[in-house]
Design a protein with these regions (language model features):
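ATP-dependent NMP and nucleoside kinases share a basic, alpha-helical "lid"
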Residues: 64, 115-165
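ATP-dependent small-molecule kinase phosphotransfer cores
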Residues: 3-24, 29, 67-126
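Short acidic-glycine-tyrosine-enriched beta hairpin
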Residues: 392-405, 526-549, 553
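Transition-metal
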Residues: 22-25, 29-33, 196-371, 436-475, ...
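Small-molecule kinase domains that catalyze NTP-dependent phosphoryl transfer to phosphate-bearing small molecules
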Residues: 2-7, 134-135, 158-219
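Ligand-binding loop in jelly-roll beta-barrel domains
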Residues: 308, 318-323, 331, 354-357, ...
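Double-stranded beta-helix
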Residues: 361-388, 423-462, 558-571
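Glycine-rich P-loop/Walker A and Walker A-like loops and their local beta1-loop-alpha1 context
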Residues: 19-63
């Protein structure tokens, strides 16, 4: 093995067992259950998360139901031209960035038509209403069809259009933008209002392999997750700078050219698996945040962030790859004013592994003038010259277990041959690329560069000396034997690292904990009061400790083995 001294046991399919419930698999079995249900109900609504395959549901499920009347609620929407006009301010002309929207599902419908349908619907007949917005029609039973955002993104890449659109071949970044800034926000508002009222919940993430559970099963599962240690289902993606480390450590396909990103700590986009008697039902992990925020986040974090999960862990693999783009993130007031976000993308790079020549670019060199830097970046963007990073940007050697702190406004990127655990605030698409080393994306298009935004947020006082004194390995030994590794005082996340060869006690510090096993083959999380079963984690796995747990033990799985965990929580 090239990068590990032991065989990796990284688990790509973590799940949480939910007792006393079953999952119904396949359209035929689901149809049988719903037909029995329809004997006692007359009007049933199929509410969809945008991205659910309408044709698949119609052909394989609706066609098998004993109903007298079928209504596609989406035929009552406003004309798409009118909707596009409504969204103009939110979608902007930019390829990547939009403005966060506050639409509700009613905004996209002709409410006069909805009212007329509600007045005319014959509740004595067996009637089915389906589509995104079906719950607007009065009903006596509701089935919710859900899908994770990563699956939606994969379907965009395969040609799926946005809701109501015919943009099959449109740039996938623009599809994602419409989803991120408009569709998913609207759908989440609707989900929060209707999911507790559903009778059944259907996982549609795998094509033609639906799985259905009862509402009680779903919410029992969400509650269990919110009171036990758990992991998210990771996903991996290639990139122009991607590396080779994750192939070995995360047990990925060795025939792929590279993997650049791994997301196993982004509840807004990841899933969880709820396991019902051996059947994994995939549920967007954001559902835990929406419906169990106090258990998961804790009162302090919920009061500050609402039903948002504020911490994000992901991997950036450049070992055997290339540099990330030189970039900067917006200051808080900039992301609020320009994009309507609540808080900004402060972050850090924890070096999980590194080759001897690994570096991190961080901050500007002492004496750099704003006008000269921006002029050089603009000339490089036009292709008139190569940007001279040696002249303008600091470059620091990076070794295993270093921690580089990156408050918003600091120019940065990882160089090649580093394996980065990125620990950051959750807003995750607001990266202003300044220079991308002259590369094209995997889609063959120039990668978006946003000097027009970046020039307004670069902090020029973060020069060589300031970075050295404030952002690199600012380690502080703590009384409990841990090491405080960050983050910077401008960032709301605190990180503590623990090395141990025996059982130690850890506290949640009044906040949800997001952790990663950064050293050792495996460790075990144990309950202090017996409330949960021992939970095994393996090297490089990210795991979440809900604030509900308060305190917990962690020990090496193998006796006397040295293990290391980094813990992130909201200060």
């Amino acid at each position: 093995m090239k990068y590990l001294k032991f065989k990796s046991q990284y688990n790509k399919y973590p799940s949480t067992k939910v007792e006393n419930h079953i999952a119904v698999c396949g359209y035929d079995e689901i149809a049988n259950v719903l037909n029995e249900h329809l004997k006692e109900k007359n009007v049933i609504a199929f509410e969809y998360y945008p991205g659910v395959n309408n044709e698949e549901i119609k052909n394989n499920l609706i066609s098998k139901l004993n109903v007298d009347c079928v209504i596609n609620v989406e035929e009552l929407t406003l004309p798409i031209q009118e909707i596009d006009q409504m969204l103009k301010r939110n979608l902007t002309d930019d390829r990547v960035f939009g403005v966060m929207s506050h639409f509700v599902i009613e905004d996209f419908y002709d409410m006069d038509k909805i009212l007329k349908l509600n007045e005319s619907i014959d509740t004595s007949k067996k009637t089915l209403i389906y589509g995104f917005g079906a719950s607007l029609i009065k009903h006596d039973s509701l089935v919710y069809f859900d899908m994770a955002r990563w699956e939606i993104q994969l379907r965009y890449r395969k040609g799926m259009p946005n809701w109501l659109c015919n943009n099959y071949d449109e740039d996938r970044l623009k599809k994602y933008k419409r989803g991120f800034f408009v569709e998913w926000r609207t759908a989440d508002r609707l989900k929060k209002n209707v999911l507790r009222n559903c009778d059944y919940y259907i996982d549609t993430n795998k094509e033609n392999e639906p799985k259905m559970i009862s509402k009680t099963a779903l919410f029992d599962g969400l509650r269990k997750v919110s009171t036990h240690p758990f992991r998210l289902v990771p996903y991996f993606d290639p990139g122009v700078w991607g590396g080779q480390w994750m192939k070995e450590v995360c047990n990925l396909d060795p025939n792929e050219k590279n993997f650049a990103w791994s997301f196993d700590g982004v509840p807004e986009e990841n899933s969880i698996y709820l396991n019902f008697d051996g059947v994994n039902v995939e549920v967007p992990s954001i559902n835990v945040v929406f419906f169990e925020p106090i258990n998961l986040l804790g009162h302090k974090v919920h009061a500050r962030f609402g039903t948002e999960f504020p911490i994000r862990f992901d991997f950036l693999d450049t070992i055997g790859g290339g540099n990330l783009s030189l970039q900067v993130h917006p200051l808080t007031e900039y992301i609020q004013d320009k994009f309507g976000m609540h808080y900004t993308q402060d972050e850090s790079y924890y070096i999980l592994d590194a080759l001897d020549d690994a570096v991190v670019y961080l901050g500007i060199k002492t004496g750099v003038k704003k006008e000269e830097l921006i002029e050089e970046l603009l000339l490089a963007q036009k292709g008139e010259k190569i940007f001279d990073d040696e002249k303008f940007i600091n470059k620091f050697p990076a070794k295993k277990h270093d921690h580089f702190l990156i408050p918003a406004g600091t120019i940065h990127c990882s160089g090649s041959n580093a394996m980065v655990l990125e620990i950051s605030a959750t807003p995750y698409i607001f990266t202003f690329k300044l220079w991308d080393w002259g590369r094209l994306g995997l889609d063959g298009l120039p990668r978006p560069v946003h000097i027009n935004h970046g020039q307004h947020v670069i902090q020029y006082d973060r020069d060589t000396k300031w970075v050295e004194n404030n952002l690199i390995n600012r380690f502080v030994a703590m009384e409990d034997g841990s090491t405080k590794t960050g983050l910077h005082e401008r960032e709301f996340i605190e990180t503590r690292r623990y090395f141990f060869t025996d059982k130690i006690k850890m506290q949640t510090m009044g906040s949800v904990n997001m952790n990663n096993l950064v050293e050792g083959k495996a460790a075990v999380i144990e309950s202090i009061n017996g409330e949960f079963e021992p939970f095994v984690i393996h090297y490089a796995e990210t795991f979440i400790i809900p604030e509900y747990i308060k305190e917990y033990y962690i020990r090496p799985l193998n006796e006397n083995e040295k293990c290391g965990v980094i813990k992130a929580y909201v200060r």
